[in-house]
């Protein structure tokens, strides 16, 4: 399913990659330059990043699996004890295959890949897709984690899981984390998330993900929700795992019912 055309400012600050190259890459994904957009996709020498030009203090959004919070989470996080690991059913030597159908910036998927799961990513928004692709390509070159990520984490060239064939593209687990409107006042929402939400908005068609997810999942579908959100599709899960601010609603696949 092709995403409708996205207009955003395209800027190159790179000495190696020209604006023409960035524009051509974006055109392949139905992204066009729109000079009045407050959002900009910027190519620097280091990476591709998203900025909100009218709120520069919010900083840039980019995908970084190698340093920063992801490095800390990989080295000092809970690993198998993390809530997402328990929710997808990691236990003992059991490492389920996973399709993350709302990949976003890839953080939960990275945690699962670091533990040893093979994770395939699907991202519906073309700008986020390019940010994710850029972050993955950089991480694949890393001496410490590059080889592991090449084996365990890949971005599929589709923009919706309904493009996948349940007969050949199935996985043990399908993971869904659709964007949900924040209850807090915007000042309390993390800066990065404010930029991200301005681009993506709330997932108004999130309910359309559950049925194809159930068709693709051999064992379970896991839906991450804010603790105050209703069930996806209004459908009662088989059980839920609750954390401080979220819950994971778990729907067992047909083979597990």
Swiss-Prot record:
GO terms for cellular component: cytoplasm. It is an enzyme of class 2 (transferase). It catalyses: guanosine(1516) in 16S rRNA + S-adenosyl-L-methionine = N(2)-methylguanosine(1516) in 16S rRNA + S-adenosyl-L-homocysteine + H(+). It comes from the Bacteria. It is found in: Cytoplasm. Belongs to the methyltransferase superfamily. RsmJ family. This is Ribosomal RNA small subunit methyltransferase J. The gene is rsmJ.
């Amino acid at each position: 399913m092709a995403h409708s055309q996205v207009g955003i400012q395209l800027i190159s600050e790179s000495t190696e990659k020209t604006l023409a190259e960035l524009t051509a890459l974006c055109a392949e994904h139905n992204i066009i330059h729109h000079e009045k957009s407050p959002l900009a996709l910027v190519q620097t020498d280091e990476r591709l990043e998203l900025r909100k030009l009218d709120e520069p203090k919010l900083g840039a959004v980019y995908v970084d699996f190698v340093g920063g919070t992801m490095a800390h989470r990989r080295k000092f996080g809970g690993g198998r004890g993390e809530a997402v690991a328990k929710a997808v059913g990691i236990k003992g030597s059991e490492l389920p295959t996973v399709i993350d159908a709302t990949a976003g910036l890839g953080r939960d998927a990275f945690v699962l890949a670091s533990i040893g799961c093979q994770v395939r990513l699907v991202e519906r928004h073309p700008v986020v897709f390019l940010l994710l692709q850029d972050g993955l390509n950089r991480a694949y070159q890393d001496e410490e984690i590059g080889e592991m990520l090449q084996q365990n984490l890949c971005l599929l060239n589709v923009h919706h899981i309904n493009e996948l064939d349940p007969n050949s593209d199935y996985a043990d687990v399908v993971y869904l984390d659709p964007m949900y409107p924040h209850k807090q006042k915007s000042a309390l929402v993390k800066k990065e998330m404010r930029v991200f939400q301005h681009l993506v908005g709330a997932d108004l068609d999130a309910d359309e993900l559950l049925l194809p997810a159930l068709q693709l999942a051999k064992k379970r579908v896991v839906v991450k929700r804010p603790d105050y959100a209703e069930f996806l599709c209004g459908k009662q899960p088989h059980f839920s795992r609750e954390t401080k601010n979220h819950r994971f609603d778990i729907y067992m696949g047909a083979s597990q019912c």
